[in-house]
From Swiss-Prot:
Family recorded in the similarity comment: Belongs to the SUN family.
Domain of life: Eukaryota
Name of the featured protein: Probable secreted beta-glucosidase UTH1
Membrane topology: Peripheral membrane protein
Organism field: Saccharomyces cerevisiae (strain RM11-1a) (Baker's yeast)
A single MF term (Gene Ontology): hydrolase activity, acting on glycosyl bonds
Major location category of this protein: mitochondrion
Length: 362
């Protein structure tokens, strides 16, 4: 079928949850959620495809990719949240064959809800004031500041990894809930298909920092509060893995795949100041100057640089997506001196058909 006859299928499905209902004795700083709009290119048979593009194979880690991205990713604002339009989308239950971080399997009913399970691969987020948890929420949208009976206690994993725990039954109003379940004062898995708390992503992207300051990259707590609190801190002159969600086997929102989303703060902003739900004009958290997207589906990795409608200011660095040595990437994507490559203000996406690519900050 000719590419001119391809259909652009916009699965515009609101992941916007109603504002969180506050428990009478508890509080939470975030009443806003993200709205995700998934745009995919399909043929007449409904198969997801990407338009033909010149394929560039990098001969070196900093080699340039020549072609224009097959699909672009845009982020537009609403009063309550940001909207992401991406070629990559999100995912369902985790794969038991994937590797995990942590010392052994998680055992239900052995850890008190008052204790954070850091020895099981989860990463404590002490600056949030939630006992290390990324968020604490029940099925009705009530939030709390301590993990307690009837609540799902969501957690972060190390860079390159994602949490495995969320209940298969999700709220009917479109909110998402994730984490370990607290029952009778003990922690239990909400997804018993896996014994580990964290699962490795596709491993097809890294963040490479070539500027003089540390950069706090903040992933969203999803499924869960969708706050941008999951940290990947890239020190000056160093690199860290980016969690590229394996969409075909990860959490799905109402039957639709989901990808990872990251808010990138200016260089020099600490993780404690940057990986939070920010306030208007703060330039941090949901007000960070740029957003990244990452997902893997049907054998292809999609990586995006996305404008944040909350903050039109350029970051204090440039960003480009660069193929690693020997890898094959379709498209070119950069954000340099406040200007996106390609169509201009809508951001850009590349597809990695073999190997991996780097988000390079320079």
């Amino acid at each position: 079928m000719k590419l001119s006859a391809l259909l652009a299928l916009s699965a515009s499905t609101a992941v916007l949850a109603a504002p969180a209902v506050h428990h009478s004795d508890n509080h939470h700083h975030n009443d806003k959620r993200a709205v995700v709009t998934v745009t995919q290119y399909v043929n007449a048979d409904g198969t997801v495809v990407i338009p033909a593009a010149n394929t560039a194979t990098s001969a070196a880690a900093d080699g340039k990719v020549e072609s224009v991205a097959a699909a672009t990713t845009t982020l537009s604002s609403t009063a309550a949240a940001a909207t992401t339009s991406a070629a990559a989308s999100s995912s369902s239950s985790s794969s038991s064959s994937s590797s995990s971080v942590g010392s052994g399997d998680f055992e239900d009913g052995t850890i008190s809800c008052s204790d954070f399970p850091s020895g099981q691969g989860a990463v404590s987020l002490d600056w949030l004031g939630l006992g290390g948890w990324a968020s604490i929420m029940d099925m009705n949208g009530n939030t709390a500041t301590s993990c307690q009976d009837g609540y799902y206690c969501s957690y972060a994993c190390s860079p390159g990894y994602a949490k495995t725990q969320w209940p298969s039954e999700q709220p009917s109003d479109g909110r998402s809930v994730g984490g370990l379940y607290c029952k009778n004062g003990k922690l239990y898995r909400s997804n018993t298909d896996t014994n580990s708390l964290c699962v490795e992503g596709q491993g097809s992207a890294q963040a490479v920092n070539k500027v003089s300051g540390s950069i706090a990259i903040c992933g969203t707590d999803y499924p869960g509060s969708e706050n941008m609190v999951v940290p990947t801190v890239v020190g000056a002159g160093s690199s860290q893995p980016i969690n590229v969600i394996k969409e075909d086997s990860y959490y799905q929102w109402q039957g639709k795949k989901t990808s990872a989303q990251y808010y990138v703060n200016n260089a020099g902003v600490s993780v404690e100041d940057g990986c939070i739900w920010g306030t208007e004009g703060s330039g941090v958290g949901n007000w960070a100057p740029v957003v990244l997207g990452a997902g893997y589906t049907d054998g292809i990795t999609y990586l995006s640089i996305i404008p944040n409608p909350n903050n039109k200011e350029a970051p204090n660095f440039n960003i480009k997506i660069v193929a690693t040595d020997g890898s094959t990437v379709n498209g070119a994507c950069s954000y340099e001196n406040g200007v996106y490559s390609g169509s201009g203000s809508d951001g850009c996406t590349v597809s990695v058909t073999s190997g991996s690519a780097n988000f390079v900050f320079y």
